[in-house]
A protein has these predicted regions:
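C-terminal peripheral helix-coil segments that are non-catalytic and often amphipathic
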Residues: 1-9, 141, 145, 173-206
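Short, hydrophobic secondary-structure boundary micro-motifs
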Residues: 42, 116-119, 182-183
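Amphipathic alpha-helical segments used for helix-helix packing
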Residues: 107-127, 144, 172, 176
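Generic hydrophobic, amphipathic alpha-helix propensity
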Residues: 18-29, 46, 71-75, 79, ...
Length: 206
């Protein structure tokens, strides 16, 4: 009982407090790594933003690079979860395409810091070298599963890989301002790509 009391403070257990500190650090990391113009991410800056001492940083992360990778993986997990939930809650291929693109826009564009972490940070942050390549298969698989009209497995795989690359470039352009189309037009264009990708080669021809 005494041990339990020592490990509990203000009604919160030690592990819960540790998890809360880790979440606060990750949230600070998203804001810093996803800042417009790419703010410098240092241990000191992260701790200052999270209002925690460096002792608590090293409680959860071995070093700065491990932290940066954890931030990226956290945003990647959020993106996967949002896409899976959107697709699962929709019926027709058209509905699934709209739901998937809308969910990604909501997560990555409405909260641009997350979008910059997932799509832009790997291009500039050495600690993320290869991280985008590691995450890509999960998104390829998700797209792959939606391309049901393509019966040939090789065709489905190649189409899914190409489509993820195209959509990634579109979202990067939308985030950095290269693409200035209205949101509705942007979503409609991405949905059209998804729908066109699901058609067998030459399937629309007579």
């Amino acid at each position: 009982l005494l041990d339990a009391q020592r490990r509990t403070w203000a009604g919160t257990g030690l592990e819960e407090r540790r998890a809360a500190r880790r979440e606060a650090l990750l949230a600070a990391g998203i804001e810093l790594l996803g800042a417009e113009g790419g703010a410098a991410v240092s241990v000191r800056a992260v701790c200052r933003s999270a209002a925690l001492t460096e002792r608590y940083f090293y409680e959860s992360f071995a070093d700065r690079d491990e932290f940066v990778r954890a931030v990226y993986e956290d945003v990647g997990r959020q993106a996967r979860d949002a896409l899976v939930a959107a697709v699962a809650s929709s019926g027709s291929p058209q509905d699934r395409a709209v739901a998937a693109v809308s969910a990604f826009v909501e997560l990555m564009v409405d909260d641009p810091a997350r979008g910059r972490v997932l799509l832009l940070a790997p291009l500039a942050e050495p600690a993320l070298g290869g991280q985008g390549l590691e995450l890509a298969p999960a998104f390829v698989l998700l797209v792959h599963q939606q391309l049901s009209p393509l019966s040939d497995p090789d065709e489905r795989q190649m189409t899914a890989v190409g489509l993820v690359g195209a959509l990634t470039s579109l979202f990067i352009g939308y985030l950095d301002g290269t693409i200035t189309a209205p949101r509705e037009q942007f979503v409609a264009h991405c949905v059209a790509l998804l729908q066109a990708a699901g058609q067998p080669p030459g399937g629309s021809r007579g």
